[in-house]
């Protein structure tokens, strides 16, 4: 049966979730698919417009309802604002933000170009801030108080935020560590508004991008020698954690960091 989404004016009867970097082959797409399965009206945003449309079409065909897809460069503060305005225009609400956009280039500190350093911080950390900054005022308007959380923000960080023994990843580690600090402060400021903000820090997650870079032996060695559960993580592992954290079952959880690494690097 084709589901027709009920609307009253410009309000949808479904909770609305905006996911950044949502249309690739990795974590973002897995999160988008899971939230769609959970019943959310998922807004698919990505720098790659074609892939946005393809994922929206895939989900629309599967669930019999339309999914909004919008191109987005999270480093552009004004562009983020335009996307948020469009979401509110289409749905009249925004309940969940998942900040998943990230970028990395491995260079040793002694040789790292200022461009590499800045671009990594722009995408990973500043992009997360840009989205939070535009979304929070709208979430606060709809607050129902701390007893009934009105909205949720999930920031995707990495175990690289504290596992700094990884060589050539200073920019990425710095950006991801910054996300954790931003998460905690934003959570402290906005709990009174009924807004929960948490971070998820994945370990090695198998995806098509990494598969093109590393041989199979790399993943096999990681699973055998580092993972406590004997395997490499999958995008769905992260999506499952996000699914729980945005649900009402996680209503008492905010300002926390959740590690999804197979026990490789538990966060102290």
Task: Place the predicted regions along the sequence by residue.
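Short C-terminal tail/terminal secondary-structure segment
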Residues: 2-4, 26, 243, 254-268
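Canonical Rossmann dinucleotide-binding motif of NAD(H)/NADP(H)-dependent dehydrogenases/reductases
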Residues: 12-43
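Substrate-binding pocket helix/loop in short-chain dehydrogenase/reductase
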Residues: 108-109, 116-121, 219, 223
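Active-site helix of classical SDR
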Residues: 132, 175, 183
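Alpha-helical segment proximal to the catalytic Tyr-Lys
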Residues: 137, 188-189, 251
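Residue(s) in the substrate-gating loop at a strand-loop-helix junction
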Residues: 158
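Short, small/polar-rich loop/turn modules that mediate ligand/substrate recognition or access, typified
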Residues: 191, 196, 253-255
């Amino acid at each position: 049966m084709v589901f027709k989404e009920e609307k009253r004016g410009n309000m949808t009867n479904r909770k609305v979730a905006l996911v950044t970097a949502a249309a690739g082959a990795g974590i973002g797409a897995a999160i988008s698919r899971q939230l769609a399965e959970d019943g959310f009206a998922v807004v698919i945003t990505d720098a790659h417009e074609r892939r946005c449309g393809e994922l929206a079409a895939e989900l629309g065909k599967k669930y019999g309802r339309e999914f909004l897809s919008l191109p987005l460069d999270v480093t552009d503060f004004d562009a983020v604002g335009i996307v948020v305005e469009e979401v509110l225009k289409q749905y009249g609400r925004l309940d969940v933000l998942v900040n998943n956009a990230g970028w990395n280039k491995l260079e040793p500190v002694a040789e790292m170009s200022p461009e590499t350093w800045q671009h990594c911080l722009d995408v990973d950390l500043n992009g997360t801030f840009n989205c939070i900054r535009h979304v929070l005022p709208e979430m606060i308007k709809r607050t129902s108080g701390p007893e009934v959380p009105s909205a949720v923000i999930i920031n995707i960080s990495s175990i690289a935020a504290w596992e700094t023994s990884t060589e050539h990843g200073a920019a990425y580690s710095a950006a991801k560590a910054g996300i954790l600090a931003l998460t905690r402060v934003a959570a402290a400021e906005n709990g009174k508004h009924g807004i929960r903000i948490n971070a998820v820090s994945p370990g090695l997650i198998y995806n098509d991008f990494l598969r093109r870079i590393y041989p199979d032996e790399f993943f096999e060695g990681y699973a055998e020698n580092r993972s406590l559960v004997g395997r490499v993580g999958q995008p769905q592992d992260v999506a499952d954690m996000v699914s729980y954290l945005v649900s009402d079952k996680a209503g008492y959880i905010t300002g926390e960091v959740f590690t999804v690494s197979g026990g490789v690097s538990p966060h102290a």
